[in-house]
Amino acid sequence: HDCKHQPAPYFRKKFSVGNPVRSARIYVAVAGLYQLHLNGRRLGDTMLDPVYTRFDRRNMYVTYDVTSAIKQNENVVGIVLGNGWYNHQPLAVWNFEMAPWRNRPAFCMDLHLTYEDGSEETVCTDYGWRTTDGGAWRKNNIYTGEFYDFSMQMEGWDKPGYDDSKWGGVRLRQAPSAQVTSQQMRPIRACREYPAVKFAQLSDNAYLYDFGYNMAGVTRFRLKGAKGTVVKVRHGERLGKDGRLDQSNIDVYYRGDKETDPFQTDVLTLSGGEDEFMARFNYKGFRYAQVEASAPVEIDKESMVACFVHSDVPQVGEVRSSNKLIEGLMAASNQAYLSNLMGYPTDCPQREKNGWTGDGHLAIEAALYNFDGITVYEKWMADHRDEQQPNGVLPDIIPTCGWGYGTDNGLDWTSAIAIIPWNLYLFYGDTKP
């Protein structure tokens, strides 16, 4: 399929193990995003892997220790791929739809097995894999959301014994870049959950959740309705005068079709049973979530929680004061900073999700006083090296698909390449970045 094809690709491979296993590791590199499975279980607790890079110059691989998950006899490894930054489908103003790397998401993987007798075996990405686009993920995009059809879930697709005879074969292609490096940084996780502080029914089939805090992340929820009911979950930061969600402050750069591919909205088709959903290939900036259903659904205040998603950097500093306003301002500042840390520092978690260099270096001192973020900034400095032209020119946003070179922002922005390494040295004594 070409890059305009929307359903997410699923892949699976069977392999047999006949000897006791001493160790097993998976190394997986993906152009796009992924969710990795082994013998019916999703691996890891991270999100939005691998982190965003300039795909035609550097790709990241992630490592998993799966020794305890390997079984004797038949095993199955499976993966679902999301578009992420690799394959932008709706239009925005930064020309990502014209990125030189743009293509359908793809992956390569090695599963290294070491047996107790010292022998070794590698299960790799070859023609032995099977694939389909007939699963529940019908559409996904980093700016808009996910379309998920519960009636199309393939029960047991990632387990031994599943009949994949109707699945197709795979096609091999080159990696986007010859440089594939280990992702050595604090991963992105859903680090905190917020229950709704307010819940309101707006009409017969519309509901509003208020989580009390502005954040980057996703919602996790369960609901029940008739099979085929379409539920839209819209996310935003403010309400209009009518008490309904208002996205007009955050969708200003979006150029896609707001009816067929709405901004910051997950669109679900229900199975008829109790369905549970959490977006995996997308994140939003929001405080409120508005649920709109095509038919009645069973839903209440406890049906939905907000998941605060960001690079999982440990907090190393804090401010304590008898003045609660100061403490509140610091808490809000830290919440805003973490909402803009997704493997690189961003300007906002909704409108753009771009790594504006000026924003990044202006926040570096506040960042390092409060959080152990060196691995994120080491990665971002590598992104700077990927983007720097032979004459030294840098773009305004990093990573970029080519947008942002030759603007009038100048040193106020691109001095990030000096200011951030200098601050990493001041805080850590580290001369490497």
Which residues does each PLM region occupy?
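Well-ordered alpha-helical scaffold segments within catalytic/enzyme domains
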Residues: L362-G373, I417-P433
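Functionally critical mobile loop/hinge segments
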Residues: R351, G355, A367, M381
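Extracellular/oxidizing-compartment recognition motifs
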Residues: H1-R351, G358-D359, T375-E378, P395-Y405, ...
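Glycine-rich, acidic and aromatic/proline-enriched surface loops and short helix-turn segments
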Residues: G32, Q335, S339, Y369-P390, ...
